[in-house]
Amino acid sequence: MQTQERGNKMRVKCVLITMTALFTFGMLADLSYAKIDPKTAGGIWLFDEGSGDTVRDSSVNKNNGTLKGGVKWVDGKFGKALEFDGKDGNVEVPDNDTLNVAAITLVAWVKSEAKQLLDGNVIVYKKPSYILQYWSTTINPGVFVGGQWCGSGWLPQAVMWDNDWHLVALTYDGSIQKFYVDGVFKGDNAACKGKIDIAASILTIGTGNTGFYTGSIDEVAVFDVVLNEDDFKIITTKGLRDIAAVFPSGKITITWANIKAQN
């Protein structure tokens, strides 16, 4: 009986040590992402399902998407990703107010080869609000304000399209747009000022009204706040998965309940 009691106490002690370690790790993760609040995300699509026709939104908004056409699962920058055929492959996300934002950060990991490039390759698009794409010889993201297109060519494609993964990001705070690649600021544009246009429309990944994307896309996110260069450097290093997992999921409570049940 004493041996069993000692065993139970030892088991509880080991689990408490594990719980403490998990809590400490969670606190450190929280500090790392203190500036990137998951609650400010309109949608975070990690593409880590690896199979099926549904991509889950890891934000609290549940803006899940559906695969359409020529899309297949491949290895990504972090976990799994989607490869688009440039013909009819895309992801459709239903319209939701959480994707209609006043200020914005639009971010995605992309991988493509120069030989795959065509004008109007759209990475992310919500009509008539915002778009991340490349056109002609440049990366061409931007927002729509007052019915006016407020984007411009930012960076020669040859800098990026080397069949390697690159993080591209666009921000707009109501007065100026900024563009980043791999966590580094590349340029700004103050052509438009005011609120981003809003309309009831789906969000698409891999297509828009100017064409279909050819290549792979991983970890797409829309935030309703403006992130900065330090934030993008964190995402470049760690990806978006840790941001989506910052808050506890109840696993510690379940573990503690199981311990009590065993004793």
Can you say where each PLM-predicted feature lies in the sequence?
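Extracellular/periplasmic catalytic domains that process cell-envelope and extracellular macromolecules
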Residues: K35-T40, W73-K77, T98-V101, W161-D162, ...
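Extracellular glycan-recognition modules
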Residues: P38-G42, L46, S51-S58, K87-V145, ...
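Extracellular glycan-interaction patches encoded by glycine-rich segments
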Residues: P94-N96, Q148-P156, G187-A190, I198-E219
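N-terminal secretory signal peptides that target proteins for export/translocation
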Residues: M1-V15
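A generic structural motif
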Residues: D48, C192-K193
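Extracytoplasmic low-complexity segments
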Residues: R11, I17, F23-K87, G187, ...
